[in-house]
Amino acid sequence: MKQLKLVLCLAALGNMLTGPFLGSSYSAVRLSMPFAVIDTTNCAPNSPTVWFAASNGDDGNDGKTPQTPMSVYGATHTALPGHRICFMGGTYAETGTFYPPRSGTPSAWIVYQAYGDGPVNVVWTPTTLACPPAGTADCTMVNAVPSSGNSYLEFRGFTFYGQGLAGDAFGCNNSHHLRFIGNTVYNVQGAGVGAVQCDYLVSDHNIVYHSGYSGTTASWTSGISYNQIKAFDCNDGLHNVISNNIAVGQYDNSPYHSDGSGFILDMNATPSACAGTAAPYEPAALVSNNVAYGNGGRCAEAFQVSFFWMMANNTCYINNLDNVNANQANTGSLSTNAANNGYFADNISVSWQASNPPYDQRNTNTNIQYFANLAWGGPCWVDPDGSDFCANNPQFIKADPRFAAAPYFDPTAAGQYAPAAPPFLLANGLTPQPVSPVYCQGVDPTTLPGVPAQVAADMQNAGNAYYIYKDFKGKARPGAGGCWDLGAYQH
C-alpha cells in the first residue's frame, strides 16, 4: 500500500472498551478452509499462565480448562505478559476491530492461539461500523497500535473470513515484535498482514486467499505487506521475515491497480535514525520459502527499499493476471522497483505470458544480485532498454520446472485471479517432479558474498531453521548429499 494509513474512530474505540465479539456463535461459514495443526501441549489446563476462551464462553467461569472457558473479552483482558490464551474451536462473530488490550515483554510474550480441537473461525459481522467503501472506520480484524497492546504478541492458528468487508486481517501501525503464524485469511478488502512503520515482524506459514476485491483504496495492498519499515533498534541482524506462506487470488481492485501481489517490501521513504545518531538505519528483511500463484499482481516485489533484503527459495507460478490495467500489463513476477541492496537466490519464477517477465527491474535499481534462480515463460526485463538480463546468465536456468500437477490457467483469459484454485486443493501440485531441472541446483543463501555477517548468523540460527534450513513442508535443507533445490519444496 503506497500510503500511510491509520484511522481510529470513536466506533472502533467502543470495541476496545467492550470487546468486538458477539457472545454466541455465528451461522456456519461457507468455505471449507484448512486450519493449522496446533501444538496443544502449551494449552495445559489449570496452568497459572493459560486461559481458555470460547465463542460461548462465560466470564463467570475461571477460564482455566476447556470445559470452563471465558469469553474472548474476559480471557484477553485477564492474560498478562508470559500468558497464553487458547481459543476453543468454533465460529466467532466479530463486530469490530479487536485491539489487543496489552503488550507482552521481551522475555514474556502474550500468545493468542487456536486450542486445536477444531478451526477457530473469526467471521467479520459488523452491525453499525462504517467500513469502506461506505465509511472510513478502522475495519482491520486485529490491529496492533500504540494506544493498546502493540508488541511482543503472537497470533497462531486462526481462520479469518473478511466477508469482503473487513480491511486487513492483521494490522500493525507503529508497532514492533509481532508474530503471525499458521493463520488463514479469506476475502478481506486488504492484506492478510498489513504493516505500516513496524519492525521485528514474522509472518510464517499463513495462507492468504482471494482478497483485495473491494474497489476502494483498502485494496491498494498485497497478501502480506511490510510498508515503510521503521527500525525499532539498530541491531545489525535480521529484523523482518515473510516465510512459508501461500498467497492466491490476490487482487488490487483499487483505482490504482498497482498491487495485488503475494508479498511486498514496500517503501522506505522515511528511514529511521539509529539511536543517538542522525544516520538513517534500515533493518534487514527476508522473504523465503513462499508460494504464490494465480495473483492479479506480482509474486513478490521490493518497491523503493534500500536496506539489505533477500528473496530466497520462493515458488512463483502464473501471477500478474490483472493485465487489463496499464499499471499491471507488463509487470514482472519477482520484481524490484527503484530498490537497492537486494538478493534473489534459489527462486523459481514462471510467467503467465511472455509480456510478464519472470524477473524484472523497473526504474533505477542498484546492487541487485541473482544467484541460482530459474526463469521460465518469458524474457527478463531491465529498464530503460528492456534487455533480458537472464539470457546467457549462468545464474539463471531457463527451463520448464516440471511441476507435479500445477494449477491450470488459460493462456489468454482475463480475470483468472478471481477463480484461482484455493490453496487447500493445491496439495503437491507445485512440487517439482524427479526429472525437474531444479533438483540440486541451489546454493545456501547464507553463504553468498556480501551478505551481512549478523544477518547470515541469524538465518543460520537453529531457532530460525524454518526460514532457510527447512522447506515449506518442514523437510531439511540441504537434502541428501548436500543437495539444495530451487523453490519452496525440497525433494
Where are these regions (language model features)?
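All-beta strand scaffolds that present successive hydrophobic residues in beta-strands
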Residues: 87, 112, 150-155, 178-180, ...
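Right-handed parallel beta-helix/beta-spiral solenoid domain characteristic of secreted/periplasmic
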Residues: 55, 86-95, 103-168, 398-401, ...
